[in-house]
C-alpha cells in the first residue's frame, strides 16, 4: 500500500479532523524511528503529550506535535500537518511553531535545553514562496519533509500504519546488476595499486549506487568518505539514496549553504534553485559545528562500526578543507577512561590518532564539472581544488560522469602559453585511468535504458493562448512565433499531449521537429 493510499484511508475513516491529525502524527513518529535517514540519528521520538518536559511550555497547544532526541542529545521540535492538497499552508501556523521552538526548557538534570532544529512535515506537494520567505534568517535551522519525500521513501507504509517500527518496515535492499558488479570488481582490483580512477557511465545506469558499493567494499563498511556534488538537489538525492541502499550504517554530515537567503553570491556559492530547507537533514558551513558533528560521528562509529560520510557541494569545498586541516593538525587527549600506566608506573595519556581524518575515498559526482582552467597567480575555482591532495588528503579518488570533458592538444598548448593549466579528464595524474565505461548505446543494447524517440508534432493556432498571441504581435516583446511554437511544442511533448493531426503527421514532413527521449 502506498503513502497516498494510507492518506486516503485516514481521510475517509477518521472520526473528525483531530482524529485524522492524531493518526498522522503517530504515523510520522513511526516513520522517523524507521526511515534510515533518521533511524540512526534519533534515539527517541515523543508525541507532545509524551514529552517529559512539556510542563515548562504551559501544556497548551503550541503547534509542536512531536519532539525527537538525537544521539548527540539534541532536541528537535516537529510539526505534522495533514493538509488537503488544495489547502494553502497557514503562515500563522509556521510562525507559531517557530516562536515556541525558540523557548527553552529544563531537562531531568535541571539543565537548560533548547531545540536545535525545527522539522516541518506536511502532505502538500509544494511549500510556497511566502512560506519559504518566512523561515529564512531564523535562529533555529528549519527543515521540511513534504509529500514527495514521504511518498518516495523506501518504507512499507502498510506495515507502518499497522503499528510496526524499525527495520521490519524498511523495503528490501536492492542488489547490484550485472554491469554494476563488473564495475565494482574492476574498481576493487584497480584501487589495490592506484589512487585515482574514473567511472564513465551513461545517465540512468546507476553510478551513485555503484559508487556506494565500491565505497562499502574498499572500506569494509567502516571508513571516512567525502562525496562531492555540484548542487544541493543532487546532495539531497544522493544522501537519501545512499541511506536507503546501504547494507551497513552511514553517519552523515552535510556541508552546504543556502545562498537563496543571501543577496550576495560568490563564485563558489551553491548556485542552484534548491533551498536547504528541502534538504531532509541538518546542514552547515560553520567549521566549528561541522567539526563537532564529525567527532560525534566517529564516536558512534567506534561503538557500532559504520561509515562517516561528508556529503558536500563542490562550492563548499573550502569549508571541508578547513575542517580536515583542523582535525589533522590538532592532537587531542582521549577521555580519562583511556589513561594507562607505563612500565615504571608513570601515567601517560592516550593521544587520538588523527590519521583517521584522512579520507579513505573522495567520490566526485558529475566529475566533468571538475575540469577547467587554472590560471597561475589566481585562486582556483572550487571545482578544480578537489584534485590537490595537499588541499584535501585522501587515499583514493573516484571520478564519475556520463559525459567526460577532454580538451584538445591545441587548447592545452594555448593554455600553457597563457600561464594557465587545463584540467582535462584525460589527465591521468589528476583523474587516474578509466576503470569502467558503459556508454548510452551499450546501455540501450543491454536493456538498461530506453532508446531515443523522435516526436513530430504541429502547433495549431487554437493551441496558442491569446496572451501569447498578443505578445507575439507586440513588436516590443522579444518572443517570436518560432520561439512560442517551440515552447508549447516542448510542453505538449513532455506531457505527451498529442492532437490527431500530430499523430497523422508522423508519416510526413513537418515544420517543427522536437527531439526528446524517454525517461530512464
Language-model regions, residue ranges each:
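ATP-dependent helicase/translocase motor core
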Residues: 3-15, 31, 38-40, 48, ...
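Active-site beta-strand-loop-beta-strand hairpin of nuclease catalytic cores
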Residues: 59, 67-78
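Conserved Walker A/P-loop ATP-binding site and its immediately adjacent core
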Residues: 223-246, 252-261, 314-316, 517-519
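Conserved motor-coupling elements within RecA-like helicase/translocase cores
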Residues: 270-273, 280-308
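Conserved two-lobed SF2 helicase motor
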Residues: 303-323
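SF2 helicase catalytic motif II
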Residues: 315-316, 330-399
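Post-DEXD/H (motif II) to motif III coupling segment of the RecA-like Helicase ATP-binding lobe
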Residues: 372-449
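Conserved interdomain linker/interface between the two RecA-like ATPase lobes of SF2 helicase motors
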Residues: 427-516
Amino acid at each position: 500500500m502506498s503513502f497516498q493510499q494510507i492518506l486516503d484511508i485516514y481521510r475517509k475513516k477518521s472520526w473528525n479532523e483531530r482524529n485524522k491529525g492524531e493518526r498522522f502524527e503517530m504515523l510520522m513518529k513511526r516513520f522517523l524511528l524507521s526511515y534510515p535517514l533518521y533511524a540512526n540519528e534519533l534515539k527517541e521520538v515523543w508525541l507532545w503529550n509524551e514529552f517529559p518536559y512539556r510542563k515548562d511550555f504551559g501544556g497548551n497547544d503550541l503547534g509542536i506535535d512531536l519532539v525527537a532526541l538525537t544521539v548527540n542529545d539534541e532536541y528537535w521540535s516537529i510539526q505534522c500537518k495533514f493538509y488537503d492538497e488544495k489547502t494553502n499552508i497557514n503562515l500563522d501556523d509556521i510562525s507559531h511553531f517557530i516562536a515556541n521552538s525558540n523557548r527553552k526548557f529544563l531537562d531531568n538534570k535541571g539543565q537548560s535545553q533548547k531545540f536545535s532544529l525545527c522539522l516541518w512535515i506536511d502532505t502538500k506537494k509544494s511549500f510556497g514562496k511566502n512560506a519559504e520567505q518566512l523561515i529564512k534568517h531564523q535562529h533555529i535551522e528549519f527543515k521540511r519533509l513534504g509529500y514527495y519525500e514521504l511518498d518516495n521513501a523506501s518504507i512499507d507504509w502498510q506495515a507502518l500504519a499497522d503499528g510496526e517500527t524499525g527495520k521490519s518496515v524498511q523495503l528490501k535492499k536492492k542488489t547490484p546488476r550485472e554491469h554494476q558488479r563488473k564495475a565494482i570488481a574492476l574498481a576493487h582490483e584497480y584501487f589495490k595499486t592506484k589512487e585515482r580512477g574514473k567511472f564513465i557511465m551513461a545517465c540512468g545506469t546507476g553510478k551513485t549506487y555503484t559508487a556506494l558499493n565500491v565505497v562499502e567494499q574498499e572500506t569494509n563498511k567502516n571508513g571516512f568518505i567525502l562525496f562531492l556534488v555540484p548542487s544541493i538537489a543532487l546532495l539531497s538525492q544522493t544522501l537519501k539514496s545512499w541511506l536507503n541502499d546501504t547494507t551497513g550504517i552511514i553517519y552523515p554530515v552535510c556541508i552546504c549553504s543556502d545562498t537563496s537567503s543571501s543577496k550576495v553570491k560568490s563564485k563558489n556559492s551553491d548556485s542552484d534553485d534548491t533551498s536547504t530547507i528541502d534538504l531532509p537533514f541538518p546542514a552547515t558551513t560553520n567549521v566549528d559545528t561541522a567539526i563537532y558533528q564529525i567527532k560525534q560521528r566517529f564516536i558512534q562509529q567506534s561503538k557500532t562500526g559504520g561509515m562517516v560520510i561528508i556529503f558536500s557541494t563542490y562550492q563548499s569545498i573550502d569549508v571541508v578543507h578547513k575542517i580536515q586541516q583542523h582535525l589533522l593538525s590538532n592532537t587531542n587527549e582521549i577521555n580519562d577512561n583511556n589513561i594507562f600506566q607505563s612500565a615504571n608506573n608513570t601515567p601517560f595519556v592516550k593521544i587520538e590518532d588523527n590519521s583517521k581524518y584522512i579520507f579513505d575515498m573522495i567520490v566526485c559526482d558529475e566529475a566533468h564539472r571538475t575540469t577547467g582552467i587554472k590560471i597561475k597567480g589566481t585562486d582556483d575555482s572550487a571545482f578544480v581544488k578537489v584534485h590537490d591532495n595537499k588541499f584535501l588528503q585522501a587515499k583514493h579518488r573516484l571520478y564519475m560522469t556520463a559525459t567526460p570533458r577532454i580538451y584538445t592538444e591545441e587548447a592545452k598548448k594555448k593554455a600553457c602559453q597563457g600561464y594557465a593549466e587545463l584540467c582535462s579528464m584525460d589527465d591521468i595524474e589528476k583523474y587516474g585511468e578509466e576503470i569502467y565505461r558503459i556508454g548510452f548505446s551499450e546501455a540501450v543494447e543491454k536493456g538498461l535504458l530506453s532508446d531515443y524517440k523522435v516526436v513530430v508534432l504541429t502547433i495549431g493556432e487554437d493551441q496558442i493562448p491569446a496572451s501569447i498571441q498578443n505578445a507575439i504581435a507586440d513588436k516590443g516583446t522579444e518572443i517570436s512565433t518560432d520561439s512560442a511554437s517551440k515552447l508549447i511544442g516542448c510542453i505538449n511533448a513532455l506531457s505527451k499531449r498529442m492532437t490527431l493531426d500530430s499523430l497523422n503527421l508522423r508519416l510526413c514532413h513537418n515544420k517543427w521537429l522536437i527531439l526528446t527521449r524517454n525517461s530512464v
